[in-house]
């Protein structure tokens, strides 16, 4: 599933194709996953923003917003393909949403209403914004259960999925099964989250071996070339040379260097 770096890369690259453009209409698969799109036909896009893994489309002279979730394999393209699910007609051309596994969702809501949606209501702060405060994170981490599922819950901070949780934990030297982090651990993890996500956004996200994520211009992301743990099972840890191990935690494949990331607490 696209995580914060992939969604932010998508937002930045499609913004010039949509901002300032008037929506002339949509063509989309008959599906409950695309809701009330007709309500924004005729409106002009003012701004694309992001909340966690969601893209938010605002409009001029309207209180409506379009909420887009990419799902497992969703993405925008400049040209259609066999997996195109939504075609957006604008006054300057078309934009295409592709989604091979059909888990993406689009929904038009009243402005601000997205914050009350079940999947968005309990979201934590944005990791690359001013609302992600060290002291708040340290205090929450001191009470947290198993750290990786805690990160994936989106409550302490938004946008981390399997890839960037593994990478952040490796960089901070924290075992994914650790819990109730010390202040020193939490400070390292806080810094690692910001560093990993910043680098991943700058690299255009991660394109894995299945190739499901591509940037809107058709190029892959490149951060997978910098992965230190994720997807490196049995390969040497770039830090110490010990083999990266993979195990399952909370139903998620988890990658760890047990030398660099010793389990400190039962």
Q: What is the predicted role of each segment?
A:
Residues 1, 79, 124-126, 215, ...:
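Intrinsic-disorder/low-complexity coil detector
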Residues 3-6, 10, 19, 80, ...:
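Alpha-helical structural motif
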Residues 1-108, 114, 264-266:
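Gly/Gly-Pro- and Ser/Thr-rich, intrinsically disordered tail segments characteristic of DNA damage-repair
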Residues 22-37, 43, 49, 54-56, ...:
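Basic, nucleic-acid-binding surfaces and adjacent catalytic neighborhoods in DNA/RNA-processing proteins
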Residues 59-174, 183:
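Phosphate/anion-contacting hairpin/loop surfaces
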């Amino acid at each position: 599933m696209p995580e914060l770096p992939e969604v932010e890369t998508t937002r930045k690259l499609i913004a010039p194709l949509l901002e300032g453009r008037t929506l002339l209409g949509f063509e989309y698969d008959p599906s409950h996953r695309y809701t009330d799109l007709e309500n924004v036909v005729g409106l002009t896009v003012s701004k694309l923003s992001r909340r966690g893994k969601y893209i938010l489309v605002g409009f001029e002279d309207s209180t409506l917003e379009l909420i887009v979730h990419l799902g497992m394999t969703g993405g925008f393209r400049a040209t259609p393909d066999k997996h195109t699910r939504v075609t957006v007609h604008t006054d300057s051309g078309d934009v295409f949403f592709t989604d091979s596994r059909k888990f993406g969702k689009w929904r038009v809501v009243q402005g601000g209403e997205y914050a009350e949606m079940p999947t968005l209501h309990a979201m934590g702060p944005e990791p690359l914004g001013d609302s992600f405060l060290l002291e708040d994170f340290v205090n929450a981490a001191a009470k947290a259960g198993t750290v990786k599922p805690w990160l994936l819950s989106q409550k302490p901070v938004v946008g981390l999925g399997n890839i960037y949780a593994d990478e952040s934990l490796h960089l901070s030297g924290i075992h994914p099964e650790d819990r109730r982090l010390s202040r020193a651990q939490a400070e390292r993890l806080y810094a690692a989250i910001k560093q990993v996500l910043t680098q991943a956004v700058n690299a255009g996200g991660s394109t894995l071996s299945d190739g499901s994520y591509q940037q809107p211009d058709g190029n892959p992301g490149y951060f997978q070339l910098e992965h230190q743990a994720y997807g490196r099972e049995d390969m040497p840890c770039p830090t110490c040379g010990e083999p990266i191990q993979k195990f399952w935690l909370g139903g998620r494949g988890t990658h760890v260097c047990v030398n660099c990331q010793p389990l400190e607490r039962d």
